[in-house]
């Protein structure tokens, strides 16, 4: 697998109920639409259960395939919300500013944004980004940072002229 294109992305929905077919995945397709509108080419989507090892393995696979891996779901404080832990286990560096920006924007709409534990980090030349599971919160969080993602990927490519 080769992360050749600067604007390729993968979208992973983390949800036990969507994984077993009890609930339709609405957040994943909404994120795909937002990314495509921002000229990202989404080359992989999948639905995974809230299982830390499975999430971590797919994050690694997708980071070798794409430049941006976006997850939705599993970022809250419930016992099975393990997406941040899986992400922290595979990234090399955190990008706290992106995390903070998403929570700040979310807090403008609801105080519950403070319960999101989503992280953002770097693995190789790939950016990994955790979004909330709620479709509206996922889209709003992505919209808060989507404008800076291309520049972040350029920086990961070593393009530091600015």
Enumerate the predicted regions with their spans:
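Non-catalytic beta/alpha edge segments that cap or flank active sites
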Residues: 1-162
């Amino acid at each position: 697998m080769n992360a050749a294109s600067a604007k390729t992305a993968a979208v992973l929905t983390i949800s036990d109920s969507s994984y077993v077919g009890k609930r339709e995945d609405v957040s994943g397709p909404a994120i795909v639409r937002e990314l495509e509108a921002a000229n990202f080419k989404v080359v992989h989507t999948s639905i995974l259960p809230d299982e830390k090892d499975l999430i971590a393995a797919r994050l690694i696979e997708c980071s070798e395939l794409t430049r941006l891996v976006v997850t939705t779901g599993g970022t809250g404080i419930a016992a099975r919300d393990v997406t941040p832990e899986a992400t922290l286990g595979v990234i090399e560096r955190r990008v706290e500013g992106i995390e903070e920006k998403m929570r700040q924007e979310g807090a403008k709409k609801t105080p519950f944004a403070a319960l999101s534990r989503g992280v953002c980090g770097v693995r190789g030349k790939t950016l990994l980004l955790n979004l909330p599971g709620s479709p509206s919160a996922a889209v709003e969080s992505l919209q808060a940072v989507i404008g800076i993602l291309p520049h972040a990927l350029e920086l990961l490519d070593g393009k530091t002229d600015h």
